[in-house]
């Protein structure tokens, strides 16, 4: 197997926006918290054969740093504070935090260290893994093929939406972590800018800066997971996470992720003060229609007009699924659709990787993501899963992976 030695990544900002948003909050409030995160391949692919090439790319990441132009760009955004940006300017990836092994064909990756540093590994490392694997499996794929497939998808969308008022349809690129390559992501987002008036932003800060579009993203599961050990009371951990986010971002970045435990458990914690303070909610697992109906009903119970709030759908979407959801909800609530893999790795003959890196420990103790889809549950410690389910008054469910 040919080892590609040139760096895949060229910018510290080639990552999802919410990583920097969370990193700033961790820098300000949880500077000394330590965590561990691990790689999971939800499919049955044996990716261990690529361990050496991935490790080489990880080693090259230590040379990434914030450029003067990037520093100036981040400084222009209203929610970043100068102390954090000054610290980020000096940040360098530490490859010693990352253990990469070929375990009998299986790819094992574990990342350990201070949360403020570990937090930045996930997205670029997943993008590296995806690009390494795809360029070996599909070496002849071109950007033209990706654009041709996008054109087909857009034409299908236009045909299917001919009788729909799309004035409130909004699309965001969430495609960094499982993209075929960085080049293809940039090509796709550029094509959408030119041909799809409903694109409102990208989660990738590097692309947002260079292409002049809005960066989008708030927080991820790890924000809620870590609070399971940071909060003195497990049953209060989700509320603690929501409260600390508002402390860091009282007027910006107000979309809350609902499925670290489950939507039902989330809504029990999401009382009137939270529902008023947050601008909306993000769906990432479970049936999206059921979830949206629950969200709207919750706002109505609290006497909040759902049309004053936004629901973000981001779970395995394509344009057809987004259109179905838009038709169902567009008269009742504001909508945004975050699409990832189906934008940046939608190429005939290419099977996208179903890969994640998730927090598994905080301060040496287990954390869990349960979610509204049992297949997405992540925790190494069954006893802790039982504790969590008991604390949040959840029924028993299938064993975690």
From Swiss-Prot:
Its EC number is 6.3.4.21. It catalyses: nicotinate + 5-phospho-alpha-D-ribose 1-diphosphate + ATP + H2O = nicotinate beta-D-ribonucleotide + ADP + phosphate + diphosphate. It is an enzyme of class 6 (ligase). Transiently phosphorylated on a His residue during the reaction cycle. Phosphorylation strongly increases the affinity for substrates and increases the rate of nicotinate D-ribonucleotide production. Dephosphorylation regenerates the low-affinity form of the enzyme, leading to product release. Belongs to the NAPRTase family. The modification Phosphohistidine is found at residue 221. This is Nicotinate phosphoribosyltransferase. Pathway: Cofactor biosynthesis; NAD(+) biosynthesis; nicotinate D-ribonucleotide from nicotinate: step 1/1. It comes from the Bacteria. It comes from Pectobacterium atrosepticum (strain SCRI 1043 / ATCC BAA-672) (Erwinia carotovora subsp. atroseptica). The keyword Transferase does not apply. GO terms for cellular component: cytosol. PANTHER family: NICOTINATE PHOSPHORIBOSYLTRANSFERASE. Catalyzes the synthesis of beta-nicotinate D-ribonucleotide from nicotinate and 5-phospho-D-ribose 1-phosphate at the expense of ATP. One of its GO terms (molecular function) is nicotinate phosphoribosyltransferase activity. It holds the Pfam family NAPRTase. GO terms for biological process: NAD biosynthetic process via the salvage pathway. Keywords: Ligase, Phosphoprotein, Pyridine nucleotide biosynthesis. InterPro entries: N/Namide_PRibTrfase, NAPRTase_N, Nic_PRibTrfase, Nic_PRibTrfase-Fam, Nicotinate_pribotase-like_C.
